[in-house]
Regions:
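Second-shell loop/turn segments in exported
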Residues: 1-3, 29-34, 43-46, 125-136
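A structural "domain/chain start" motif
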Residues: 1-26, 153-166
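C-terminal/domain-edge helix-coil "capping" segments
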Residues: 83-92, 98-166
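Structured segments of extracytoplasmic/periplasmic soluble domains
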Residues: 15-22, 46-53, 61, 142, ...
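A composition-biased, non-transmembrane "mature-region" signal
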Residues: 25-29, 35, 109
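Surface-exposed short loop/turn segments
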Residues: 37-101
């Protein structure tokens, strides 16, 4: 589900569409989703409305750390307190290929990125947000490489199986 496209590019979607065995790639938008999304089942139902067979579900988990502790929720004021400490932003993008009809998980992929520096450059919320977006983009790019590998394996296994049934 893309409610806001912060890190995804048209090139990313073109890369996914070019994978073997992919007939088309589309994003599920908010119109197809309930007001309060509660489960992967609801995402699968939305993908089914678009006649999708497999949904690539991914999530971004971003955490902010200083040398002494995990900081959340992150604000410029919070990092300003730790100006002499080294801070890290760590983002992991986890993805799963899920059968729209059955919920079967065909495979998973993951990418992680880290940005580390002294806290003092992250004094404004805009600077913190820019660093967050950078790590999220890098994690997503890393996950895309793993997604391509996983999909190639999934496609090879299941296309062989369905071809044998014909």
């Amino acid at each position: 589900m893309l409610t806001t496209r912060d890190i995804e590019t048209d090139e990313d979607f073109a890369q996914l569409a070019a994978l073997p065995g992919i007939a088309g790639v589309g994003a599920v938008n908010r119109i197809l989703l309930p007001m309060k999304l509660r489960s992967a089942q609801e995402l699968r139902e939305a993908a089914a409305q678009l006649r999708g067979d497999i949904v690539l579900l991914y999530t971004l988990d971003t955490q902010f750390h200083t040398e002494s502790k995990l900081v959340a929720p992150l604000k410029a004021v919070t990092l300003g307190v730790f100006a002499s400490e080294k801070s890290r932003i760590v983002t992991t993008c986890a993805a799963a290929f899920i059968d729209v009809r059955t919920g079967f998980v065909y495979g998973v992929a993951e990418g992680t990125a880290t940005e580390a520096r002294r806290s003092s450059p992250w004094k404004t919320e805009a600077a913190i947000d820019a660093a967050r977006l950078k790590t999220e983009r890098e994690a997503f790019s890393g996950a895309l490489k793993e997604i391509a590998k996983a999909w190639t394996s999934i496609n090879a296994e299941y296309n062989r199986t369905t071809a044998a049934l014909r």
